[in-house]
């Protein structure tokens, strides 16, 4: 199971850009999002300069332990500058392959362990860049009562909603935890759902 990355919609002002807008650097391509209504330009939007800058900044804010390659967040920008051409080319030609996730055991209160997969920093940045583009597409499809890992929503809002239901007279709560959900979800079904909304086959 992979550790979820925090997803936010931000304008990303300030320093520490992957590539400053006025200075050639790392990593971006000279393409601007066309915002085609058929969604066939998602790949360009993912690799657009500002989107990559935002993705890098968000990964830096999230922090977290290194992945299997041992790269820390402090080394990510240096890596991007040194490997600009090969990094971008691998994304464009479809040869980019994410690294295996690092398996980590987290102790559970009942004595067991929760297995987590920690992605490499560069993979987190790419995941974040993709999420920032496709999140608005799927956000409107989610349940109004879903509060987990969604921009602009929080656990506090979920608590307030529960209090609202309690004040309406509801007195019972059903606590459900799906065992090994990310390991057992039907990925083919999930991919079919994604294909219905994402028409850019490069993504």
Task: Please provide the spans of the model-predicted regions.
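Non-catalytic terminal/accessory segments
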Residues: 1-203
